[in-house]
């Protein structure tokens, strides 16, 4: 199974988290082939040169070759590249699993947090772009923890 891993990849923390998750995915089964864009030095060695068309063509080709796209949705906003990859996968009906671990999504039953929504600039919850999330959900699902993420990947593998 070919899996495309979409995630932010410009901060050291992002790179390390991506490596951590991809190792866990690869350890699920020997038949899994994960494409992690940050491992593609031809376009993602930031000391070298790759123009926008080179990057778009290389990553789009790998999205289109995938049987599953998995995406890290965490961040101030969903990473622009991740959103683009999700759009390509949606258009080609490629199944998707989104991972959204932001702790601000917790407390949906806390009445004080809910009441604060009526006070300007007091949103206690994190916002994700609903269009992008909708594309993921139309072709799959979004989960909030790593184990559920890995379980869904394994479930998809066994279909």
Predicted regions span which residues?
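Conserved catalytic or regulatory cores that recognize and/or transform ribose-phosphate-containing ligands
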Residues: 1-159
